[in-house]
Amino acid sequence: MRTVPLFAACLLLTLMAQAEPLPRAADHSDTKMKGDREDHVAVISFWEEESTSLQDAGAGAGRRCICTTRTCRFPYRRLGTCIFQNRVYTFCC
């Protein structure tokens, strides 16, 4: 049960680190707006404690997960969705 809050905190920190700072008023008039067709990817890594069933079953020590606008590619599998700044992303592990 401690894994879910830890995972949520890692996800939040990753998404906050990738967020762009707000432009200043002077910078806003000089820059062009980017299109919405960019592929956004967030990489998240989390590890289970040694005593969990994943470790007992012989699974790897860590799992790497991403939130992407595309479909999951091998070896990742879709496990759900990520929502950031009112956009829905595919959550792949």
UniProtKB/Swiss-Prot annotation:
Compartments where found: Secreted
Q: Found in which tissues?
A: Bone marrow.
Question: What GO terms fall under cellular component here?
Answer: extracellular matrix; extracellular space
Report the PROSITE patterns cross-referenced here: DEFENSIN
Q: Which GO terms describe its biological process?
A: antibacterial humoral response; antimicrobial humoral immune response mediated by antimicrobial peptide; cellular response to lipopolysaccharide; defense response to fungus; defense response to Gram-negative bacterium; defense response to Gram-positive bacterium; defense response to virus; disruption of plasma membrane integrity in another organism
- Outline what the protein does: Has antibiotic, anti-fungi and antiviral activity.
Please give the family membership noted in the entry.
Answer: Belongs to the alpha-defensin family.
Q: What is this protein called?
A: Neutrophil cationic peptide 1 type B
- Per the UniProt record, the source organism is Cavia porcellus (Guinea pig)
